Amino acid sequence: MGPAEQRHAMDTLMIGALSLETSRLALQRSRRPLVRQFAEFEAEESTTVAQVIAEMTGMAPPPLRPVERRLVERLARANGPAFDREYLVGQITAHRQILDVQERYLSAGRNMHHRHLAMLARGRIREHLRELDLLQRSRV
């Protein structure tokens, strides 16, 4: 595995770990059914992507860095609509970052398996960004 593949895997795992942690929190704390549904799907997908990367590379998600841990702690202190707002904003930020990771790899990476993962992930991430935009606008 070359440097581009290592970076692709690690960046995907790192962002996915934060998304998973905040989505688990949203499953417990959100009062909005559609936000909880999104969080459930996101948690399942983040877990699956981490499993795929582990099988491809032997790499596991890293522990959250201090800055990410502080984001989770801040989210955990929020309640009600403020919680949902913070969660959705965080998910949009994370999805934009992970989309950039996939596009960066697709522009230069050559490993077929990583390219396939990046192609599949890119489509789902774009869908998630549209869903997150709708969730931000709705009150359900």
Give, region by region, the residue ranges found by the protein language model.
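His/Met- and acidic-residue-enriched segments that coordinate or traffic transition-metal cofactors
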Residues: 1-140
